[in-house]
Amino acid sequence: MTLYEPFLERAQQVLTRRLELAPYPIPVGFERKEALVRGEAVVTTSTAWQSPKLRQIRAAHVQGGGALQVLNFVISPRLEYDLPFFGADLVTLPGGHLIALDMQPLFRDDPAYQAKYTEPIVPLFEAHRAHLEWGGDFPEEARPFFSPAFLWTRPKETGTVETRVFAAFVDYLNAYLDFVERAEPVTHPEGLAAVERAQLRYLHYRAEKDPARGMFRRFYGPEWTEEYIHGFLFDLERRREAVHR
């Protein structure tokens, strides 16, 4: 079993227990992709679900030996809810581990939104931050898309990933699903429009700045990569365009 497969397995167990899951359509050619790189197979697998309040729950898992392991796990709410996104980027490269966990806010600087979705998880963040050293600087342009409870760390030991990071991942996911259970739909037209704009802004940023783009291009080529990013990983823009045609 790879380093991040237990994370995905636990996520699926938690999601199955707490949500009414249904399959989310994965475009042809994206469920599994394989390339031979320097004599070693690099395999990318995709899984996805949806639920009554969550538009897309999806995971991209990359396995290329012990020095290349990635799990990108993102939950996108339906446009009728002002829920934050759930984001987990778990990356192991030859240079070490890079871990990012957060509930990315739609309206980061809105005090009412912070009180609703960020302040309740600050104690959880503080509890895990005590054992996971801050990972250092990250791009200034990314700051609007992360909450004050953003857990960003570069563990030196794989054992830390298997224990401390795993525990943080499960706790953050359960806390997010607590928010989902309590979420009520937005009904005011202005509020719905604001939610859609905020979701599109976040997903556009993620698609344009996806740090995996270079890796995927090297492994699978630019055409497959761009279609994978825009047609599956961050697909809201594409889906909205299809609806309005």
UniProtKB/Swiss-Prot annotation:
It is an enzyme of class 1 (oxidoreductase). One of its GO terms (biological process) is phytochromobilin biosynthetic process. Keywords: Oxidoreductase. InterPro entries: Ferredoxin-dep_bilin_Rdtase, Phycoerythrobilin_Fdx_Rdtase. It catalyses: (3Z)-phycoerythrobilin + oxidized 2[4Fe-4S]-[ferredoxin] = 15,16-dihydrobiliverdin + reduced 2[4Fe-4S]-[ferredoxin] + 2 H(+). The keyword Oxidoreductase applies. Disulfide bonds: none annotated. Pfam families: Fe_bilin_red (PF05996). GO terms for molecular function: cobalt ion binding; phycoerythrobilin:ferredoxin oxidoreductase activity. Its EC number is 1.3.7.3. HAMAP family: PebB (MF_00793). Catalyzes the two-electron reduction of the C2 and C3(1) diene system of 15,16-dihydrobiliverdin. Belongs to the HY2 family. This is Phycoerythrobilin:ferredoxin oxidoreductase. The gene is pebB.
